[in-house]
Regions:
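Phosphate-binding P-loop
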Residues: 1-4
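Conserved lysine of the Walker
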Residues: 17
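Hydrophobic positions on the alpha1 helix immediately C-terminal to the Walker A/P-loop
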Residues: 20, 24
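ATP-dependent small-molecule kinase phosphotransfer cores
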Residues: 33-98
């Protein structure tokens, strides 16, 4: 069984992660690879809550925010529709911006 790649770009805000994800995604697609690119926080309902907290500077306990990030990461990994594991099983190289 062929194993597919999961590639994560990590760094501080503004360090070029999204740019690198796009460049690598485009390059691999041009080479004929199936590629699924994603980011965290995700676009899921949980990810939207996280984004709103930071966008609107909503005060929240750091433990609550950490719990939301954990929940978003688990959904990102295990989601039966578009989760990382599902996409790897479908033969995609998965590239994420964290």
């Amino acid at each position: 069984m062929k194993k597919n790649l999961f590639i994560a770009f990590e760094g501080v805000d503004g360090s070029g992660k999204s740019t690198q994800v796009k460049l690598l995604t485009d390059s691999l697609k041009k080479s004929g690879h199936k590629v699924y690119s994603t980011c965290e926080p995700t676009d899921s309902p949980i990810g939207s809550v996280i984004r709103n907290i930071f966008k609107h500077r909503i005060e929240a306990d750091h433990r609550v925010i950490a719990g939301l990030f954990v929940a978003d990461r688990l959904d990102h990994l295990l989601n039966k529709t578009n989760g990382i594991l599902k996409k790897l099983e479908e033969g995609y190289t998965v590239i994420t911006d964290r």
